[in-house]
Amino acid sequence: MITIHKKIQLQPILPTDITHLQKLMWDIYPPAYSYFWEDDGAFYVNNQYSKENILIELSQENAQYYFVVFNNEIIGNFRVVWNEKLTGLLQEKQVKLHRLYLHPKTQNKGVGKTIVSWLEAQAIFKNYEVIWLDAMDKQEQAFQFYKKRGYKYHAHIFLDFD
């Protein structure tokens, strides 16, 4: 367990935690993103949080996958992939902030800000030049969160789930 603030820890996700992660994402994703999808986000959650996909993501080299713990309760997940390059950027050392999902009851409490600040400090310490991520521009709250922190728009992409 990594303590990044007195009330916030990162707990590594293990293969034995898959069911817990899946349940957590059913609590988090549909309330925030259901209006994007005809099926209220079921396809996305079932696809991205299938046992098979989680095992692939847990085994990926240079990836770290955590539960976010706030006040001793698991309230989200956070995943980074070191040395993951964004097409079109020339900087050698890049890290992808792949996932940061927090339960709606803990939003606007500084948890996301604290986690992103911790990642930025880790990147600086490891001499990384770029942190990048994919954010849905239709999810205005998340998009503005990163924009306020100085992240810049790079390119528009479309999710392909075929």
Please give the residue ranges for each predicted region:
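Flexible nucleotide-binding loop
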Residues: 109
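Conserved catalytic-core motifs of GNAT/GCN5-like acyltransferases
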Residues: 134-135, 147-162
